Amino acid sequence: MNDLKLLRSKLSTETIEELYKNLNLLKKELFNLRFQQALGDLKNTSRFSLVKKSIARIKTELTKRANSEEY
């Protein structure tokens, strides 16, 4: 639970460029995980959910910032 709070505070302090950079890295990792799964080489399947949730958290932070700039 503390890791989640740390991640949220880290996301709120990162710049938009850093968030997009991390988002692209996570998308590449997700692609590689899917590729490994297709080949049958994937050992840690729980990594899928962690990467997907991290992507969602970053997208949520970006949306929150975009909405706050509109008002």
From Swiss-Prot:
Gene Ontology terms: biological process: translation
Pfam families, A to Z: Ribosomal_L29
UniProt key word Ribonucleoprotein: yes
InterPro entries: Ribosomal_protein_uL29, Ribosomal_uL29, Ribosomal_uL29_CS, Ribosomal_uL29_sf
Keywords, comma-separated and alphabetical: Ribonucleoprotein, Ribosomal protein
MF (Gene Ontology): structural constituent of ribosome
Electron transport found in the keyword field: no
GO cellular component, one term: cytosolic large ribosomal subunit
Family per similarity comment: Belongs to the universal ribosomal protein uL29 family.
Protein name per its UniProtKB record: Large ribosomal subunit protein uL29
Name of the gene this protein is made from: rpmC
